[in-house]
Amino acid sequence: QAMLQELGLAEEDIERLETLPYEALAEAYKKVSPAIQEKGGYVGCVPIPNEYYPGDPRVVGFTPHARTIPVLVGTVIGEMCTFGPGLPDRRTRSREDQLTYLRKFLGDKTEELVPLFEECYPGRPITDLVLLDTFSRVATKDFCRKKAEHAQSATYNYLFTFDFPIDDGTPAWHCADIPFVFHNTDKVPVCNIPGVSDQLEETMSSLFVNFARTGVPTAPGLPQWDPCVPGDLPTMLLDRECKLVHNFDDKLYEAYLPVAVNPKDLHEEEVTMLH
């Protein structure tokens, strides 16, 4: 109703929304949504709970049918936090330079967080700490753990941690795993590292196809992949070398989330991030 009013339309004209340019719809939504949200109204990008859709299973629980369906769910290391320009020379900076950079954003927490990060991601530049996904990883782990309470079907978790050959190496951003899943990295030049990305693509596309066929994510050369069970969240790290880790980043996120950096604050000048 608020959008219709903003656009100068009556309720009986609602079908005209289908004919309007996206830009007009987006501008109307941005204008009216803050006031609606402030009053407790629904603003979001998921279905409104009803008889057909009970709601987020992490909140309302899994339906009897959903408990029987195997699930493969994962995220990428950076998600929304690596859309912006990369940090120059991130792999060649001295450790002291990297620590100085981190202290600008994390202050006294730097000394606590760096060892936790290095335990999770040995060999990575420690500056990647402030690029960690704070949008999807925690919610995904919560979903997996709650789904794993139902033994009728298996739940598998992955984390795509590949570095792309752009801006001195950029950790994977939101949806960066999709070309590997669908075996079409040849159509996305930024994906390609000869002899590396093609092998990872073969592994990832194979495991998804095999999961769709059998309910178990397998691929030649991929380590044994254990499903999630109460108390244990195995996560397959998909990268140059794929490996299975268990409950590996719980302590890191517990310490980092209270001081997590807004990605926009990482850049001294304003940048436009396109998705």
List the model feature ranges, each with a label.
Residues 29-31, 114-119, 158-159:
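Short coil/turn segments at secondary-structure boundaries
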Residues 96, 103-118, 122:
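Glycine-centered helix-coil hinge/cap
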Residues 137-275:
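Mobile gating loops/cap/lid regions near enzyme active sites that modulate substrate access
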Residues 20-24, 29-33, 105, 120, ...:
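Alpha-helix boundary/capping residues
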Residues 1-97, 126-150:
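Substrate-access "cap/lid" subdomains that shape
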Residues 113-126, 182-192:
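Short glycine/proline-rich turn/loop motifs
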Residues 120-122, 126-134, 196-203:
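Contiguous C-terminal substrate-recognition/catalytic subdomains in enzyme active sites
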Residues 85-106, 223, 228:
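Short Gly/aromatic-enriched secondary-structure transition segments
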